[in-house]
Amino acid sequence: FYSFLELEHLYDSAIELVKTQLNIFDNEFSMRFQRNPIHNIESRIKTPQSIVGKLQRKGMPVTPESARNNLTDIAGVRVICCYIDDIYAIADLLTDHSAFQLRKIKDYIKNPKPNGYRSFHMILDVPVYMSNGKEIAPVEIQIRTIAMDFWASLEHQLHYKSTGDPKIAASLTGELKECSETISGIDQKMQDMFKKINLL
């Protein structure tokens, strides 16, 4: 029934719907509160090669239907927010949206990964209305602050470059976790300063 091209169109459409709704929220905040909680929105769709590789690793049939039924991270949206409170505000708005169905939440801000990674993850089932009817596509959404995104981007680069030397990799692991703690503290300070300014 599905080709990989049709699959890509479905998930691309779901991403556009989520991004449109995020921009509506952001513009409303700008109008009502004179500020934008969202700094940036990024998105991506897994390539057919990446989808095939993941299905093979999971020992599942390598077909578009199998990908549709078994993978929830084909479509991804990353929302970069200004403050920690903005993350939860955006997550709540998406969760409460009547068109979207919440499938899963993982809060790596309150419960960081062992390596120091912090972000708020959620999977939403997004309805896409095609010419032949409604289709549901899961979209993985990562919401994080500018500081969290800075750490995650550099951690990925450093980890990738250090894999050839186990000693350097082990040393970097500890240092990166320390950096994560420092950045988390800065995030909280910025949040506190923002709250003080709002009380003026």
Locate predicted features.
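Short amphipathic alpha-helical segments
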Residues: 73-77
